């Protein structure tokens, strides 16, 4: 056979997008994406896409903590305290961070506490140290009164059991890793393939092996380019030894690489020359699906499935290799759920309009965590304290509020925003939900929506606002706050989901009630039923149920399924003060497959929540 006849020219070039789409379809048929999932230590999971939805299993914090250095007190003892009329308290102990004071304090007593220290069981406020003065080894003068719960981080104020910590396909940014660690989680499932890189070519010499290659030889350089670019993604990369242009050696190198890796990259041997053997090996070993891309440089690119694994052949010329990696290989890996961080900066800086008023701290620039919604450049700052790592991890940006502004930043004002991570393409805006309802919603969207989801669980008024601006793809709104929904009917499809709300009470050390954000239906109800009681702020029914169960509050407002959980766990039956029938309106943008979303959502409601939620079609 002549040299000419042994060549196999590349005749049919494929568009990059078509090649990627075709490969994804073929790889999905063999369950390839699932094979890329690895359970790894949190330290190894940074910047990876999570392969599971993780719900909070404990409250954070799980005990009352001080958020300042000062003195834990009974707020009742300081009602009359002022600069002119200080109150003398007896100092009965000290608690450092990491410690817990297990004894109750008596009338007129206090305990010194560090920031983060646990409070005595019946302490209900903390006086900052700057408002006090020592009057002896066991005496403290207090020059200010404090309110119930002031400077206290209540249990579940950051995360409650059943909260979503990470949604499947979320990129595990550093703050999300910290939120997982705060749950006691040390390992997590992520998409993190093992990749082997094999340079080929009889002409190649390993850098450092000789002072200068002999004529005809060159230093191998492309593997350094390939490895360093791939390592901007969530992968484990190993580079093999240089393989000469010998069919048997290439076959053996492929066999070795397939044993321990999910994906194999060959460099070189992909063109039509007599010594280009990689494409011949792939043709005989598996299914060669791509041979030639319609790009320059980079035409001689290969892709094959061998032993149910992905093998890619890159051109040998380094510039071609670079172009194919950026235009084809890395986009293909991203479609396989492998996250790449190729931008030069972790943060991007934009200006956006405030969805709600915002207030800077007095005398300081305030960097407030927020939800950035890039569909129309809006930003929604959240209420938070600096210990709230879970709340922080659920946002995707920070708003800068400059010091020196008197009063509030008004709605619609442009503010500088630092956005971190990738843009969220699918917006879910929701009323605060029970743990079971939340799980039903998340399970539905995980199974159907193949986009990055931003879950904004900030109450019905926020959800309605985002729906009116056509920002929310899914909005879940309480019937008590759903005025004006008719105007959205041409843009959203909808269903109604019935839920029963109960106001319950029990005996507790303090007559206190959970107070919800005013943006939620729970806030409206708590305004009515918590009058005359001390107030403990909560965000969700999940947090309220935990505090009620543990006796931190004597009254709360819950969806009935959370009450069932309280009764079954504690064995006592709370007193029902009132029952309220409510309906959640679930809105779905008409450009989505709402029929499928609603069908799956209702099935999940039925399987997760039992008979407590009854779906009704609008």
What is each model feature region?
Residues 242, 452-459, 531-544:
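Short beta-strand-to-loop elements that line the ligand-binding cleft
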Residues 381-385, 391-396, 403-471, 511, ...:
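N-terminal hydrophobic or amphipathic helices and topogenic motifs
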Residues 426-432, 506-528:
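Short loop->beta-strand "edge-of-pocket" segments that line small-molecule binding or catalytic clefts
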Residues 2-17, 186-314, 318-328, 443, ...:
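Helix-rich terminal scaffold detector
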Residues 13, 17-20, 32-43, 47, ...:
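Flexible glycine/proline-rich
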Residues 2-16, 71-244, 255, 377-386, ...:
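Short, glycine/charged-enriched hinge/interface segments at domain edges or termini
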Residues 445-513, 541, 557-563:
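N-terminal segment of the mature folded domain
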Residues 496-501, 568-600:
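Periplasmic-binding protein-like
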């Amino acid at each position: 056979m002549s040299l000419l006849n042994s060549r196999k020219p590349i005749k049919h070039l494929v568009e990059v997008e078509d090649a990627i789409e075709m490969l994804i379809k073929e790889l999905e048929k063999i369950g390839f994406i699932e094979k890329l999932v690895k359970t790894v230590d949190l330290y190894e999971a940074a910047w990876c896409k999570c392969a599971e939805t993780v719900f909070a299993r404990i409250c954070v914090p799980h005990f009352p903590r001080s958020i300042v250095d000062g003195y834990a007190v009974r707020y009742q003892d300081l009602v009359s305290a002022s600069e002119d009329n200080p109150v003398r308290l007896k100092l009965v102990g000290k608690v450092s961070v990491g410690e817990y004071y297990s004894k109750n304090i008596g009338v007129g007593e206090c305990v010194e506490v560090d920031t983060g220290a646990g409070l005595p069981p019946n302490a209900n406020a903390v006086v900052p140290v700057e408002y006090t003065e020592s009057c002896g080894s066991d005496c403290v003068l207090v020059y200010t009164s404090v309110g119930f719960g002031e400077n206290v981080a209540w249990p579940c104020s950051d995360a409650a059991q059943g909260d979503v910590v990470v949604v499947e396909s979320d990129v595990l940014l550093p703050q999300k890793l910290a939120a997982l660690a705060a749950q006691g989680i040390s390992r997590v499932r992520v998409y993190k393939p093992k990749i082997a890189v094999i340079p080929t070519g009889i002409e190649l010499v390993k850098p450092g092996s000789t002072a200068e290659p002999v004529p005809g030889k060159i230093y191998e350089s492309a593997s350094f380019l390939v490895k360093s670019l791939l390592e901007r993604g969530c992968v484990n990369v190993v580079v093999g030894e240089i393989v000469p242009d010998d069919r048997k050696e290439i076959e053996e190198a492929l066999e070795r690489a397939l044993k321990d890796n999910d994906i194999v990259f060959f460099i070189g041997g992909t063109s039509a020359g007599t010594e280009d053997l990689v494409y011949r090996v792939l043709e005989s070993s598996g299914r060669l699906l791509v041979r030639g891309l319609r790009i320059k440089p980079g035409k001689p690119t290969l892709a094959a499935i061998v032993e149910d694994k992905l093998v890619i052949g890159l051109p040998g010329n380094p510039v071609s290799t670079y172009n194919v990696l950026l235009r084809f290989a890395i986009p293909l890996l991203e479609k396989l759920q492998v996250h790449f961080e190729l931008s030069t900066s972790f943060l991007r800086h934009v200006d956006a309009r405030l969805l709600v008023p915002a207030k800077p701290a007095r005398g300081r620039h305030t960097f407030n965590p927020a939800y950035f919604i890039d569909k129309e450049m809006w930003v929604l700052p959240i209420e938070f304290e600096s210990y709230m790592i879970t709340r922080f991890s659920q946002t995707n940006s920070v708003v800068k509020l400059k010091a020196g502004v008197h009063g509030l930043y008004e709605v619609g004002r442009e503010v500088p925003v630092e956005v971190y991570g990738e843009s969220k393409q699918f917006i879910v805006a929701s009323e605060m939900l029970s743990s079971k309802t939340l799980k039903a919603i998340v399970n539905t969207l995980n199974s159907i929506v193949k986009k990055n989801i931003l879950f904004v669980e900030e109450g019905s008024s926020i959800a309605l606002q985002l729906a009116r601006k056509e920002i929310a793809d899914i909005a879940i709104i309480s019937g008590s706050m759903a005025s004006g929904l008719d105007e959205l009917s041409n843009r959203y499809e909808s269903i109604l989901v019935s839920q029963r709300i109960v106001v319950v009470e029990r005996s507790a050390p303090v007559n206190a009630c959970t107070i919800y954000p005013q943006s939620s239906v729970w806030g409206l109800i708590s305004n009515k039923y918590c009058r005359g009681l001390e107030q403990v702020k909560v965000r969700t029914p999940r947090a309220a149920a935990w505090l009620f169960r543990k006796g931190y509050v004597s009254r709360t407002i819950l969806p009935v399924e959370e009450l069932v959980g309280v009764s079954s766990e504690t064995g006592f039956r709370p007193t029902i003060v009132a029952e309220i029938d409510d309906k959640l309106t679930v809105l779905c943008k008409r450009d989505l497959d709402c029929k499928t979303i609603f069908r799956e959502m209702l099935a999940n409601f039925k399987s997760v929540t039992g008979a407590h939620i009854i779906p009704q079609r609008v």
